[in-house]
Amino acid sequence: MAEPSGVAPELLALRQHIDNVDRELLALLNRRAGLALEVGEIKKREGSVVFRPEREAQVIDGLKGTNPGPLKNDSVAPIWREIMSACRALETPTRVAYLGPAGTFSEEAALGYFGSSLVRLPCASIDEVMHAATSGAADFGVMPVENSTEGVVARSLDLFLTTPLFIIGETSLVVRHNLLRKVDELQGIEAICAHPQALAQCHRWLSHHLPDVERRPVASNAEGARLAGLNPALAAIASTRASSEYGLHVVSPAIQDDPHNRTRFAIVTHPSRHPAPKASGHDCTSLVVSVTNRPGAVHDMLVPLKNHGVSMTRFESRPARSGQWEYYFYIDVEGHPDEPKVDAALKELRAVCAFFKILGTYPIDVH
């Protein structure tokens, strides 16, 4: 492409260097893709899986550790995630189910974890995400499990009790809610459509700026954006991705009450299609347990972790549906069952529990 006249010679020279580097990068990327295809052929012969989250976590950690700059490590991870996603897609398409429609934070989490070279399968509910991953319609499901403002996603935790799926990864997003509308103004809004959690997370802003406007719960923020795209009297609370998807203006950005609002997602799959990840060196093990209702039972449950020096990073309780005032406890611990101290602690914990289920072991979020 011809450069405009009057451009400084130094700038022209630098642009030429950048063009040359880009061509070198393209050649190297294609060389990497060729090697990935060779790896894929070996995996097919051996019956191995294409996606290995612990391997990708180790690659990204290694690159961050040797990065000389000036490129920041926060940029290294998404760049290589897209490279690995594109190479993985050459071996086999990755089908990922998530809470839809297009433009949800669940879709953003799926793209952030797997990269953009995937087959997207938006679902109408969390239950449908689980069903898609269980039935084989999807290779993986993306499940919201916890929000820093609103707490746990109860339906997801309840489904983990009985599902055959297990967790092979996690990712989290900083959630920025925006007020979206077909018309770029606050006046004349009759109702605000959003997921109940989004409405709760923006309560103070809505009460201050739009106190008399109806708050209308819908299945997802993206569904609210879709409805707002059809009716200029409606507004939605959703992501900037949703604003682009449905042709809406960002009337007011970042209206969430907590500027550090973050949602955590679990990546789930079926054991018949994907083995549990091997130890990566920076792992988390999630489990759900229950104990008999007796004095000191919860204390006894935690003693094995303390005695073996296993750190607990999450502890949530959910009432059982037995009607007997019993509870399930959802626990995250640092480490992998292949580590002797973690293995010993989990064996002792299992012995004191009435119910014990490992939900998954996976690399700690590097995304």
What are the functions of these language-model segments?
Residues 1-367:
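Domain-level signature for soluble enzymes in the chorismate/prephenate branch of the shikimate pathway
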